[in-house]
């Protein structure tokens, strides 16, 4: 970005702000890789600002960031070689998020911090769209299963409710860290109970977006106009880096005000290291 934040074009990718915090346009024109996209995002509701997240490794601050998440619809097209996907706002609802602050991007610190410890990070992040509302919740747990960060919001046309007492019940696929079912519950500001059941259908690998990618990680400069893409067989599911981090497309069943509704969203999963409630004791051991 040449040290200019208003220059939102990087190589073949350009992001245009049509209306701040409401409408964005994403253009991708990469004739060398035969990848093109023209997508417009329009927010359904106001963005939700998540609480500030500060994480430390001993005295070192490893993360000090804030994120906003917004639900909305997508419209446009994506083409790759001889295939084209038409995206219509009536069929394609989803979310977008943006964070700012200190995050572990670029090359890692060459100075290790003794004593060396097993890395630990338990992250669940779950935005969802329903016909007349949206919801968003997330967890960060320590190794004992205590939430160090959590947040939950439900948005309606005329109402935004920040929930409290967020709880979870997680079922894993045997021998793995993949989630087969997730149940969440929380209390609205009026004291009424809300619950979700998430049923994962399929997933994508976040290394395709640069997370934990061995060569094209976030903040790695490859040249002015360099680009690449990876191809993954989603029927295969390796459980080693960089494939630990996924977003699972889920059916959401929400029970709110004694009414049940179904929606669609994602459950982002990054589960590394010990987590007592799950029975995880080592870096990458699976469910018993």
Where are these predicted regions, by residue range?
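Structured soluble/peripheral alpha/beta segments that form catalytic or ligand/cofactor-binding pockets
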Residues: 1-288
């Amino acid at each position: 970005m040449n040290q200019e934040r208003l220059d939102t074009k990087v190589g073949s990718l350009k992001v245009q702000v049509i209306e701040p915090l409401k409408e964005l346009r994403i253009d991708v024109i990469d004739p060398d890789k035969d990848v093109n996209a023209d997508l417009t995002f329009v927010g359904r509701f106001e963005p939700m600002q998540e609480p500030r997240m500060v994480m430390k490794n001993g005295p070192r601050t490893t993360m000090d960031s804030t994120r906003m998440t917004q639900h909305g619809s997508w419209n446009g097209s994506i083409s790759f070689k001889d295939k084209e996907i038409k995206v219509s706002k009536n069929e394609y609802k989803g979310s977008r998020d943006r964070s700012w602050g200190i995050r572990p991007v670029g090359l890692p610190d060459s100075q290790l911090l003794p004593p060396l410890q097993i890395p630990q990070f338990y992250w669940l992040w779950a935005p969802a769209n329903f016909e007349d509302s949206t919801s968003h919740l997330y967890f960060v747990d320590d190794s004992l299963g205590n939430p160090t960060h959590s947040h939950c919001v439900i948005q309606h046309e005329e109402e935004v409710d920040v929930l409290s007492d967020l709880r979870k019940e997680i079922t894993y696929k045997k021998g793995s860290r993949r989630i087969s079912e997730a149940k969440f519950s929380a209390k609205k500001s009026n004291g009424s109970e809300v619950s979700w059941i998430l049923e994962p259908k399929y997933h994508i690998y976040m290394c395709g977006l640069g997370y934990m990618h061995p060569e094209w990680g976030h903040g790695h400069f490859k040249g002015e106009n360099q680009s690449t893409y990876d191809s993954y067989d989603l029927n295969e599911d390796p459980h080693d880096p960089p494939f630990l981090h996924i977003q699972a497309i889920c059916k959401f069943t929400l029970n709110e005000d004694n009414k049940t509704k179904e929606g669609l969203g994602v459950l982002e999963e990054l589960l590394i290291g010990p987590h007592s409630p799950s029975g995880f004791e080592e870096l990458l051991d699976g469910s018993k």
